[in-house]
Amino acid sequence: GSSTDTIGRVRVPYHIAAEGYPAHVHLKWADNVGSTYNIYRSDESGKFRTYAQVSGNEYMDFSIGTAEESRNYTYRICPEGFPVDSASAFEIKVDIPAATDSALLDMVQKYTLRYFTDFAHPQTGLARERSNDINGDIVTTGGTGFGLMSLIVGAERGFITREQALDIIGKTVAFLEDCEKFHGAWAHWYDGDSGRTFSFSKYDNGGDIVETAFLV
């Protein structure tokens, strides 16, 4: 995609990337904070139609459905108010694989891996409990166990490099060695930023043998 982030006074997307899956397309770009973008997709006639308006740096188009044959689409990501006919610089073509068992397995594995790479806590490497936790940046030990397995599979399949997997695993092991434990067991949750145990309630200390089993 384009590496330019301004045209006149209009802030535009850059470093546009896209990946096609059997039932959707994942679009990503480098975002200019505060910008709004219109997502266009061309039909068979070559005309572009608006599919969404978003703020941020990614969009998933689930409107393509599935098909037994591979397909391709062209997208344009335009700043609000920017004419689509003049937006060829913000265009990207993407191939959609047929909905085979192999393609669906790739999709599931890649999206599972993304949770444990893109959404891993940056300092500890542990898996976050969820994206909307009102209690802060809470990480989970049981979920991290699933994440460690996903990292190994992702590296083996070439979705990430071995060095990327090792970086996250190294952070995780370093945190788990030093954090508070309970007769050898880890807590269910920790505050990723402070490293302190996050308990279920004031009546327990946070230690969790089940989550420890999932982790190890």
What do these predicted ranges mean?
Residues 97-139, 183-185, 189-190:
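Low-complexity, Ser/Thr/Pro/Gly-enriched N-terminal "stalk/linker" regions
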Residues 99-101, 145-160, 175, 214-216:
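Well-ordered alpha-helical scaffold segments within catalytic/enzyme domains
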Residues 175-216:
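Extended ligand-binding groove/face enriched in aromatic
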Residues 104-116, 160-177:
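Extended, well-ordered alpha-helical scaffold segments
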Residues 36-72, 82-88:
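Recognizes extended acidic, P/S/T-rich segments that occur
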Residues 128-144, 197-212:
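Solvent-exposed loop and edge beta-strand segments that line ligand/cofactor-binding
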